[in-house]
Amino acid sequence: MKRRTARERAMQALYQMDITGELEPKIAVENTLDEGEETNEFLESLVVGFVENKEVIDEAIRQNLKKWKLERISIVDRSILRVAVYEMKYMEEIPHNVTINEAIEIAKTFGDEESRRFINGVLSNIKDTL
């Protein structure tokens, strides 16, 4: 599985967890996989890592929102931000610009017209604080 695909699946897993409020990370990951597709370490580390660091990640996002509340952001955008912020804060081997570009590409696919600009702005602000 390519890293872009893993990031997309991680976003989808966080989306499911946000909607249900109680789904286990491993089950959420399994629900995103196509038939016969297997998970990989990168995908699982994104989802489990977010769950383990949810408060820190959400606070980093909150502090970089202008005129927005985290709870008012679309679930898709919130999930994309959460995956990207986890990656930026805890996966130091991945350059921040790569993470931001990947998040923007995922936003183009799954978000609305404004998603990519919004996500780019928030992640760029967060990058400056790391």
From Swiss-Prot:
GO molecular function: RNA binding
Annotated Gene3D superfamilies: NusB-like (1.10.940.10)
Any GO BP annotation: DNA-templated transcription termination
Keywords associated with the record: RNA-binding, Transcription, Transcription antitermination, Transcription regulation
Gene Ontology CC: cytosol
InterPro entries per UniProt: NusB-like_sf (IPR035926), NusB_fam (IPR011605), NusB_RsmB_TIM44 (IPR006027)
Task of the protein: Involved in transcription antitermination. Required for transcription of ribosomal RNA (rRNA) genes. Binds specifically to the boxA antiterminator sequence of the ribosomal RNA (rrn) operons.
Similarity field: Belongs to the NusB family.
Protein name: Transcription antitermination protein NusB
Organism expressing this protein natively: Bacillus cereus (strain ATCC 10987 / NRS 248)
